[in-house]
């Protein structure tokens, strides 16, 4: 099947963005990541107007939905390129754009360092031997699966890169530490930061729950983290 691939390109934050279109003639079972790799393998790479263009900048690593590096807007929805297959998308025109909530690096690459900086500010580490409650094993496992891809932040109406609100990714990852830390002073510090950087800023739209590319039980983890940090339950 022949697909038209529309890509929003931009050389840097200071330059203007523009659209380029490419043709992909291949299997509907191809992933968006496969499409991008195939386009960049062309020598030279030409757009649909016949112009020779530079390779498309995008990030990838595992290619099997394990790292979150390839997060981007696919048909205006944040998804992972490696696990989004053409047959799951409507029509023969595929639109690719960078995530909009993070500073642009180039083309489809963004700088997600604010995500990790927010986790550092929450000080999510253990200062005591972990308390392993068997009743929380399943949600702790789900919390650890988070790819930190940023899709939940992209759709969150309360998150901005310049704000204090850290978003669902912080609450999901906080759950393990809030339930494993036994040192009361450190736990109180984490709880205070959690209230400031998540609980007080969450509008409870739960758009983060529906968008998670690996289907984490985000709502459940938010509820559990809130209970642990705010009410000590």
Q: For each predicted feature, which ranges?
A:
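Eukaryote-biased recognition of intrinsically disordered, low-complexity regulatory segments
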Residues: 1-22
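Broad gene-expression machinery/nucleic-acid interaction feature
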Residues: 2, 69, 93
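Short, thiol/selenol-centered motifs that function as redox-active sites or metal-ligating centers
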Residues: 5, 67-70, 149, 156
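Residues in well-ordered beta-strands of folded domains
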Residues: 6-8, 25, 83, 97-99
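Short, contiguous acidic and Ser/Thr-rich linear segments
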Residues: 19-31
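Ferredoxin-type iron-sulfur electron-transfer modules in oxidoreductases and energy-metabolism complexes
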Residues: 30-51, 92-233
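A basic, amphipathic helix-loop patch mediating RNA/tRNA/ribosome contacts
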Residues: 40-75
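Glycine-rich phosphate/adenylate-binding loop and adjacent beta-alpha elements
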Residues: 72-96
């Amino acid at each position: 099947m022949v697909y038209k691939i529309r890509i929003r390109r931009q050389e840097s934050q200071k330059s203007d963005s523009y659209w380029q279109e490419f043709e992909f003639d291949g299997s509907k079972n191809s992933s968006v990541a496969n499409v991008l790799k195939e386009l960049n393998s062309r020598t030279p790479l030409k757009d649909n107007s016949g112009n020779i263009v530079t390779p498309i900048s995008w990030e990838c690593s595992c290619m099997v939905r394990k790292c979150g590096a390839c997060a981007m807007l696919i048909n205006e929805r944040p998804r992972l390129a490696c696990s989004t297959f053409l047959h799951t998308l409507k029509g023969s025109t595929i639109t690719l754009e960078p995530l909009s909530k993070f500073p642009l690096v180039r083309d489809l690459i963004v700088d997600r360092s604010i995500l990790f900086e927010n986790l550092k500010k929450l000080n999510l580490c253990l200062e005591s031997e972990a308390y392993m409650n068997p009743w929380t094993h399943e949600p702790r496992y789900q919390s650890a699966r988070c790819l930190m891809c940023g899709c939940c932040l992209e759709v969150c109406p309360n998150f901005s890169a310049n704000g204090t609100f850290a978003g669902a990714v912080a609450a999901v990852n906080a759950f393990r530490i809030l339930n494993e830390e036994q040192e009361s002073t450190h736990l109180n510090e984490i709880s205070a930061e959690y209230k400031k950087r998540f609980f007080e800023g969450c509008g409870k739209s739960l758009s983060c729950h529906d968008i998670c590319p690996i289907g984490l039980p985000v709502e459940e983890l938010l509820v559990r983290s809130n209970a642990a940090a705010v009410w000590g339950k």
